[in-house]
């Protein structure tokens, strides 16, 4: 009994100093996904997917877009009378066309290689319209009667502003031979056309000659078109059709026209004065009097995030498009606040069960307790190394994904619908693969980040363990219990790696041996007490059984026979 009292006295007098390794925790509810887990709560995370836009068409880096309103590109370039506001346009950053603009080819017909022309506009920022063949120069032909009710203007018949529909004059249509030399330093976009009458009567009525042609030639073009006379249903009140063509005339090159009828001659051409990144966007939005660096058909994006899921077609300095709904990068640690029922310390790195909300100036650090008090201290060196390692994470992901598939909206005419459908399938396939790669990379980076933090905590723990050696014992929860007194100066030496093991080793050895001796003696006492307790319990049980038997025999409840 005296030894038990001695043990209790020693335990009550000795309150060991402790130092613990831990990590930061906060009230964050941000969650990330990793390869192995979903919805992992972390202290810090960065959303890298932009989901919002302003719903407006904006200027791009200070340059307004060319919004064609109810006009198509064809209506603008040919000069549909309902598109007069676009006869002369300033520099544009991109072109906006509605899905089905009502003011296109007012006189029914077709525009050859229309999609290629639109592709050309995707690398053009400014046209300068110049006159190449004046209307007044057609003295042998009627250059004013070529109008149609299909192209009305102020209630009267009119025609495309930038070309001239030549009709016979005085019942004659002399063969046309005209040339134009491009003496400009810029390329020229030139447009012309041919009229396909409804019947032979219309052919001779307009052009006198029953058999006609239109020939056009440059150093790279050799084209001869013949009118196709056929009965057709009326469109916009017209049974005839018009077919338009275009070419790019290089500087110092010449274009030659020859025709004896059905010729729609160019009056104006477009000098391509500025080339650059542009686009034709399909959108019904209006101009929002705003400026942006990134524009989509559904609105402008103003974001520094590396990815977006708003629309695959963009122009400008834009985040990369993915089909994902969520991309969040872990930049902090697993957020596991300490549990009060487990005490202060408790497992990141496999042995610490909770983070410290009290440590706010670092990701990893220490908590100590001694006679002078207790407190937290962040490990600035390991925290800074971790911050440096994670700061460039977003740029790293972008660098790894530098082969993004750029979705380009291509348009195809009715004869190329199969190609269009194939293009869309290929584009969707590329975007699916691109999105999968981004999502996988984010999952892997998140796994790597959390493992990185775990490793840093474990390294900090090992740093302390290697310093203290047998001067302290590991408690198994990230803490060490000193076998010697460790004041604040001693604690600081452990934290900064200058702990003097020999200085404290003798005191630690004596305390360690004393505690071990008390434990051994107490084990002997416990063994004696256990034997005594067992014997006493057995004797008491035997006396109870004997007494019960004697009582039952005396009242006849139990018969006892003794045989000799």
Swiss-Prot record:
Lipidation, S-palmitoyl cysteine type: 553, 560, 563
Source organism of the structure: Influenza A virus (strain A/Chicken/Scotland/1959 H5N1)
One biological process term in Gene Ontology: fusion of virus membrane with host endosome membrane
Note: Major glycoprotein, comprises over 80% of the envelope proteins present in virus particle. The extent of infection into host organism is determined by HA. Influenza viruses bud from the apical surface of polarized epithelial cells (e.g. bronchial epithelial cells) into lumen of lungs and are therefore usually pneumotropic. The reason is that HA is cleaved by tryptase clara which is restricted to lungs. However, HAs of H5 and H7 pantropic avian viruses subtypes can be cleaved by furin and subtilisin-type enzymes, allowing the virus to grow in other organs than lungs.
Record topology, Extracellular segments: 17-527
GO molecular function, one term: host cell surface receptor binding
Gene3D superfamilies attached to this UniProt entry: 3.90.20.10, 3.90.209.20
Designated name of the protein: Hemagglutinin
Annotated Pfam families: Hemagglutinin (PF00509)
SUPFAM superfamilies listed in its UniProt record: Influenza hemagglutinin (stalk), Viral protein domain
Cytoplasmic side: 549-564
């Amino acid at each position: 009994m005296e030894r038990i009292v001695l043990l209790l006295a020693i335990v009550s007098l000795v309150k060991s100093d402790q130092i613990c390794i831990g990590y930061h925790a906060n009230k964050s509810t941000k969650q990330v996904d990793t390869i192995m887990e979903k919805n992992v709560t972390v202290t810090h995370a960065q959303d890298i997917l932009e989901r919002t836009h302003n719903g407006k068409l904006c200027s791009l880096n200070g340059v307004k877009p060319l919004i064609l309103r109810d006009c198509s590109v064809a209506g603008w370039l040919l000069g549909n009378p309902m598109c007069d506001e676009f006869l002369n346009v300033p520099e544009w950053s991109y072109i906006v066309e509605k899905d089905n603009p009502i003011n296109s080819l007012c006189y029914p017909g077709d525009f050859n290689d229309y999609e290629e022309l639109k592709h050309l506009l995707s690398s053009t920022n400014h046209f300068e319209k110049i006159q190449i063949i004046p209307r007044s120069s057609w003295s042998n032909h009627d250059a004013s009667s070529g109008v149609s009710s299909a192209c009305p203007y102020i209630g009267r018949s009119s025609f495309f502003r930038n070309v001239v529909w030549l009709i016979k004059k005085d019942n004659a249509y002399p063969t046309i031979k005209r040339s134009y030399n491009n003496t400009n330093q810029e390329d020229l976009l030139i447009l012309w056309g041919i009229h396909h009458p409804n019947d032979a009567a219309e052919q001779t009525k307009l052009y006198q000659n029953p058999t006609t042609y239109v020939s056009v030639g440059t150093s790279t073009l050799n084209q001869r078109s013949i009118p196709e006379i056929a009965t057709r249903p009326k469109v916009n009140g017209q049974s005839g059709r018009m077919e338009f063509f275009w070419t790019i005339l290089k500087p110092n090159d010449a274009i030659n026209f020859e025709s004896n009828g059905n010729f729609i001659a160019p009056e104006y051409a477009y000098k391509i004065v500025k080339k650059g990144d542009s686009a034709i966007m399909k959108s019904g939005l209006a101009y929002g009097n705003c400026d942006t660096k990134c524009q989509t058909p559904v609105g402008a994006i103003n974001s520094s995030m590396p990815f977006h899921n708003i629309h695959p077609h963009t122009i400008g300095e834009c985040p990369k498009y993915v089909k994902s709904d969520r991309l969040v990068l872990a930049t902090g640690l697993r957020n596991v606040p300490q549990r009060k029922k487990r005490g202060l310390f408790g497992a990141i790195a496999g042995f610490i069960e909770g983070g410290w909300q009290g440590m706010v100036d670092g990701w990893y650090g220490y908590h100590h307790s001694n006679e002078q008090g207790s407190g937290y201290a962040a490990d600035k060196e390991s925290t800074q190394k971790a911050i440096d390692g994670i700061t460039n994470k977003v740029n790293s992901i972008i660098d790894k994904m530098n082969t993004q598939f750029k979705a380009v909206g291509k348009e195809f005419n009715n004869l190329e619908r199969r190609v269009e459908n194939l293009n869309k399938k290929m584009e969707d396939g590329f975007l699916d693969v691109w999105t999968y790669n981004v999502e996988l990379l984010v999952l892997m980076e998140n796994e790597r980040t959390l493992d990185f933090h775990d490793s840093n905590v474990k390294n900090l723990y090992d740093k302390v363990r290697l310093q203290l050696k047998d001067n302290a014992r590991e408690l198994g929860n990230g803490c060490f219990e000193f076998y010697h007194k460790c004041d604040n100066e001693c604690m600081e030496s452990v934290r900064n790696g200058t702990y003097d093991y020999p200085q404290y080793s003798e005191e630690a050895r004596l305390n360690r041996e004393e505690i071990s001796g008390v434990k051994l003696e107490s084990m002997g006492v416990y063994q004696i007490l256990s034997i005594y307790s067992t014997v006493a319990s057995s004797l008491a049980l035997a006396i109870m059984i004997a007494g019960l038997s004697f009582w039952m025999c005396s009242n006849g409840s139990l018969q006892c026979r003794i045989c000799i």
